[in-house]
Amino acid sequence: MKSSKVAAKEGRKSYKVADLKEFWSGQKYIELLDPNTLACEDWKDILWQLANSGAYVDFNQGVDIRLMTEKKAEIIQKMRTKHIHFAWDSYKDKNIIVPKLKMFKDITNWERSKVTVYVLCGFDTTMEENLERIQIIRDLNFNPYVTLYDSQHIERGSELKRLQRWVNNKWVFWKCGSFDEYMKM
């Protein structure tokens, strides 16, 4: 599921430790800090509690889209949420992730104003694979957001840094049709 470093640090699974009513007292916002809520055995109960709360739910971590099902998407669609973030860390997961993103879009009808997909670049991908993932996300009308692996050791002005600058500046990204077009500016 997660990369081995993240899995060793955070684990591969979430566990429900309490019902929402045990620590939530009607605030307008609920912020989820767990990217693996969908991996929890009690996911359905947790998602329904969040949906039924009426509060805005903030999925502020990159939710593992590989764990998305139609039922999970249907419940998430019923939540009051301003935004959800998914993670696409490895190009190798393309055949799993792309159908899941399409299914999520078909069920929720959410677009880039509500969906961001984190794209990890510079770990085990080529520039062509990075651009392909970004284009797939763009074609779905979701917002890609480039994160760089070991970014402090990537040279300033490098192709990866310029890719990150283009994609993460949403105004420029949606105005420039391609990375090549951006590079000519």
Short names for language-model regions:
Residues 109-110, 120-185:
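Auxiliary Fe-S-binding modules of radical SAM enzymes
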Residues 50, 101-108, 137:
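Hydrophobic positions in alpha-helices of CheY-like receiver
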Residues 1-100, 114-123, 143-147:
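Core AdoMet radical
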Residues 73-75, 102, 159-163:
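Short low-complexity, flexible loop/linker segments enriched in glycine and/or proline
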Residues 99-102, 131-132:
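Charged helix-capping and loop-helix junction motifs
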Residues 51-54, 80, 105, 167-171:
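Generic secondary-structure transition motif, activating predominantly at the C-termini of alpha-helices
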